[in-house]
Amino acid sequence: MRFTALATAILPLACNVLALPAKTGEAPKLDVSLSQVDNTLIKAVVKNTGSEDITFVHLNFFRDKAPVKKVSLFRNATELPFQGIKQRFRTEGLTEDALTVLAPGESIEDEFDIAATSDLSEGGSITISTDGFVPIATGNKITGSVPYSSNELSIEVDAAQAASVASAVKPLDKRTKVASCSGTRSSALSTALKNTVSLANAAASAAQSGSSSRFQEYFKTTSSSVRSTVAARFRAVASEASSTSSGSTTYYCTDTYGYCSSNVLAYTLPAYNIIANCDIYYTYLSALTRTCHAQDQATTTLHEFTHAPGVYSPGTDDLGYGYDAATALSSSQALNNADTYALFANAVNLNC
């Protein structure tokens, strides 16, 4: 990892799915209906199909204005690379603009252009779908999660039209003036990287040959091949975090692309292997928590490293955010979920 940590840059989903019981009728769930508006412009209608109001966090989800991953795109059963951002957000003190409330039967709509976050200039047949768990909140704190899933939408993409869509994320001009990270932020990030190395190495050992019940708890299998894969990703994270002058990623201690908000801790641009911290990474998070399943600077950095394909390919997604959502995933989903790795490392460190 190259530790540039600049003020301006120079290089090119929650908890407790069972914590929201339905009193009567349908269990809490969001249904996502995907349809094609025009070529690569897609509309999602998100409907509360349960019997109670749901207040959910729409960061990394529909209604998020940032270029986040809202759907998965497939060509001939192979997923296409995502070229937007993946962000980690706070679990407490969420501001109202991060929350959406849906009454039973109520829905919201979101239109977005999939060509803005994936290269579709080849055109042809594309299949689109999404599923996972979205965080729910009570009193501005994440207190659970609900599942969501969509229909499978197949479309024919006009190559020329898709190529004309501007990319949502562009590499920054290399001529941009550089201002190096220093002072307390530099010190905090250096400490976080050292802690990340320790956490990832310990997690790698635990994944490879530690408690099978703990591994089952987080990754929903005790398969030796899966344990080896998880251990390999953790070792790759430890290796990447151990150097500030080499590696596959570039890590900034400030908001390189302007995607931070009052709720976002850090984000990754997987297409460029760039990671950036936000202001609240330093003000909201402790260096290393002593609480099981809690967030801190080290596990946030570890979480972001798992998103970067340059560290270990393929990079992870955000399919379940927080302990209960992450542990509700299937084994294949958990293997591809950033927070599962952060939570497992936290559990190994604190013997949760």
Swiss-Prot record:
It catalyses: Preferential cleavage of bonds with hydrophobic residues in P1'. Also 3-Asn-|-Gln-4 and 8-Gly-|-Ser-9 bonds in insulin B chain. Secreted metalloproteinase that allows assimilation of proteinaceous substrates. Shows high activities on basic nuclear substrates such as histone and protamine. This is Neutral protease 2 homolog ATEG_04941. Its cofactor is Zn(2+). It holds the Pfam family Peptidase_M35. It is found in: Secreted. One of its GO terms (molecular function) is metal ion binding. SUPFAM superfamilies: Metalloproteases ('zincins'), catalytic domain (SSF55486). The active site is at E304. Residues 1-19 form the signal peptide. Zn(2+) binds at H303, H307, D318. GO terms for cellular component: extracellular region. Belongs to the peptidase M35 family. Binds 1 zinc ion per subunit. It comes from Aspergillus terreus (strain NIH 2624 / FGSC A1156). InterPro entries: Fungal_M35_metalloproteases, Lys_MEP, MetalloPept_cat_dom_sf, Peptidase_M35. Disulfide bonds join C181-C253, C260-C278. GO terms for biological process: proteolysis. It is an enzyme of class 3 (hydrolase). Residues 20-175 form a propeptide.
